[in-house]
């Protein structure tokens, strides 16, 4: 079995990647920046390694002897005040990691990008041949993910890129689980008018491992899931939890106006608002993703949303994240 290097291992997708890699018999060195991350990584069978994406020398030492890099770390902030930090992590960090991988003679670089690299500026169903417009986007998350992906595509290393859509599943503490907790507490002020493609975090991790095993170098894979409006999604959550929910969607213009109002307040408080103009724009977008290439070449599975949501809610209950029923 191989020795590999993983970033983002203490996060949502990264934790599942770590479990899949360890389960397949690989030795996983995982980037860690704190004692809490050390413990989380060790609990899943990984070897925590202290290094920083902003320090190429520390990365080169950490990568020595590794056959592959799985890069899943990212800054997903939707607040413009975090743009410089986000660019440093997503773009500069990826470039540093690529350079370190070349120096260490790593054989493959597997990069978790995002469907956001295509940007909300794209309309219709996205396929791997759809031109990416993240470089034109005013949303820094989209812009930074686009630039990071381009850096990977330009490297002489053998590479594979993955573009997951809305990731859901057990282990989610900070993504869609935040919305689910608002529904559970009946504090959701409104529902965005967009459409999402809900992807199973477990299947994303399995697809990445298969892509490496099958040496699908030079390929990009969209990893989507069942399409659903956010109204439909929230109503399914409400029904499963026995909670009332808003009946319809908040108009995009009203959501954006609310986000701008919160942004004005944030100038004085210095605290990141619950809704930002960037977040309002993305959740008002009608995202449609074609995963047929991944299904065909990686045996990727689009888990039905009701099943995926059921697993997510069961895990959240087991973690005490939902009110007792």
Segments predicted by a language model, with ranges:
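Short-chain dehydrogenase/reductase
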Residues: 87-91, 127-130, 134-149, 166, ...
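Mid/C-terminal beta-alpha module of Rossmann-like enzyme folds, strongest
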Residues: 207-275, 291, 296, 304-325
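Conserved beta-loop-beta element that borders a ligand/cofactor-binding pocket
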Residues: 149-170
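Substrate-positioning beta->alpha
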Residues: 96, 147, 175, 192-212, ...
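Conserved Rossmann-fold NAD(P)-dependent oxidoreductase catalytic core, especially the SDR/UDP-sugar
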Residues: 89-140
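Conserved catalytic-site region of short-chain dehydrogenase/reductase
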Residues: 78, 115-124, 167-173
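N-terminal Rossmann NAD(P)H-binding glycine-rich loop of SDR-like oxidoreductase domains
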Residues: 4-24
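NAD(P)H-binding glycine-rich loop region in Rossmannoid oxidoreductase-like domains
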Residues: 35-42, 46-92, 100
């Amino acid at each position: 079995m191989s020795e590999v290097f993983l970033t983002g291992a203490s996060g949502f997708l990264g934790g599942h990647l770590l479990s899949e890699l360890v389960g397949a018999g690989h030795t996983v060195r995982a980037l860690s920046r704190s004692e809490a991350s050390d413990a989380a990584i060790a609990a899943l069978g990984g070897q925590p390694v202290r290094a920083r994406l902003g320090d190429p020398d520390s990365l080169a030492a950490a990568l020595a002897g590794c056959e592959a890099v799985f890069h899943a770390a990212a800054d997903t902030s939707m607040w413009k005040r975090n743009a410089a930090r986000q660019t440093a992590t997503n773009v500069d960090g990826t470039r540093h990691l690529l350079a370190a991988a070349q120096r260490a003679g790593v054989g493959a670089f597997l990069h978790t990008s995002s469907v956001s690299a295509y940007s909300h500026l794209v309309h219709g169903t996205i396929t791997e041949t759809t031109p990416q417009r993240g470089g034109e986007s005013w949303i820094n998350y989209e812009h930074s993910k686009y630039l990071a992906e381009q850096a990977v595509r330009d490297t002489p290393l053998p590479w594979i890129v993955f573009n997951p859509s809305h990731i859901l599943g057990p282990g989610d503490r900070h993504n869609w689980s935040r919305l689910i907790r608002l529904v559970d507490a009946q504090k959701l002020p409104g529902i965005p008018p967009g459409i999402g493609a809900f992807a199973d975090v477990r299947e994303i991790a399995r697809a990445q491992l298969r892509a490496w095993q099958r040496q699908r170098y030079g390929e990009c894979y969209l990893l989507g899931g069942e399409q659903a409006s956010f109204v439909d999604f929230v109503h399914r959550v409400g029904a499963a939890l026995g909670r009332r929910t808003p009946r319809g969607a908040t108009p995009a213009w009203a959501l954006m106006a609310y986000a701008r109002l919160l942004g004005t307040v944030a100038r004085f408080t210095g605290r990141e608002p619950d809704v930002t103009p960037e977040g309002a724009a993305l959740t008002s977008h009608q995202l449609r993703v074609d995963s047929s290439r991944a299904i065909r070449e990686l045996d990727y599975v689009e888990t039905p949303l009701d099943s995926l949501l059921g697993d997510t809610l069961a895990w959240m209950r087991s973690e005490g994240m939902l009110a007792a029923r």
